[in-house]
Amino acid sequence: EIHILEKLSIDGIITTNWDDTAERLFPQFTPYIGQEQLIFSSTYSVGEIYKIHGSYRDPKSLVLTEDDYDDFSKKNPYLAAKLITIFIEHPVVFLGYSISDSNIQEILQSIVACLDNANIQKLQDNLIFVEWTSDEDYAMTIERQDIMMANKVNLPVIKIKTHCFKEVY
């Protein structure tokens, strides 16, 4: 399935993975490692890889420990400010994350805090969560779902559930 992904025309990648899979699949993309690099760089939102939990190539960038995660959380508003344009202007597909993942929830909460209801609605077709199931006979489903954020705001997203990512690609 990963070979299908590398043939797709995508705008960019946001990942928490430390490995170099994204760079190997899309060598023409510019990687930004860690929140610091992303926050303080001039990005164009196209042809870029955002490695928000760091990279094994730069051990100081890794988000590993509880203290690292606390520091990551403190910087979420800055990260959200950088990502908000991407989320509004481009579809964002979340692979390998649960909608309930605490890191994703924190980032989305920071983004929602910057938007009024009208702009939150503009995100409804751009946030797509793909959930994998181990059931080989599962027929892919696509549904709209509201995520209740901590501030009691509903964030509309699209949820795809599948056993085979090939169908999604």
How would you label these PLM feature ranges?
Residues 19-21, 55-57, 98-100, 135:
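Short, solvent-exposed loop/turn segments at secondary-structure junctions
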Residues 66-83, 110:
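Active-site glycine-rich loop that binds ribose-phosphate moieties when present
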Residues 9, 13, 70, 74, ...:
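Generic amphipathic alpha-helical segments used as scaffolds and interaction surfaces in large
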Residues 46-72:
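A charged nuclease-like catalytic/ligand-binding cleft shared by nucleic-acid processing domains
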